[in-house]
């Protein structure tokens, strides 16, 4: 069991495979505790997000239309011993299940629907003093 930083409002989410410069990961509102804070920032009870402007890696999807991907997902909780308001906390390093990104690929002179599978990870908890396991 390893002890890790607990994710708070302002944490950083990153893709493990693609993304691109104009890709946005937008955390859905109203998922933080109204009672529990770490370093003055609200702790996440759940962490659902939407993805827009996604570009698949050229090595795997060379015909992907840049910025055409979108999808949504949720970080999977790994904490076993720390809960807030009945929910296990989200830790730095936690990842989502595989997310299906829907987008477009070039096919000749037109585009066709395509998908790519991605994983999102909490790479920075947004604070470094409060830890959980």
Tell what function each PLM region has.
Residues 1-133:
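Intrinsically disordered, low-complexity proline/glycine-rich segments
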């Amino acid at each position: 069991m390893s002890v890790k930083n607990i994710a708070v409002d302002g944490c950083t989410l990153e893709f493990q495979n693609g993304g691109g410069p104009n890709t946005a990961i937008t955390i859905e509102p109203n998922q933080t505790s109204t009672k529990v804070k770490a370093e003055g920032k609200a702790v996440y009870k759940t962490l659902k997000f939407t993805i827009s402007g996604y570009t698949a890696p050229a090595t795997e999807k060379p015909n992907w239309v840049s910025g055409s991907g979108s999808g949504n997902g949720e970080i999977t909780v790994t904490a076993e011993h720390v809960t807030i308001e009945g929910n296990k906390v989200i830790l730095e390093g936690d990842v989502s299940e595989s997310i299906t990104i829907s987008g477009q690929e070039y096919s000749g002179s037109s585009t066709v629907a395509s998908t790519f599978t991605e994983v999102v990870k909490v790479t920075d908890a947004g604070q470094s003093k409060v830890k959980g396991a």
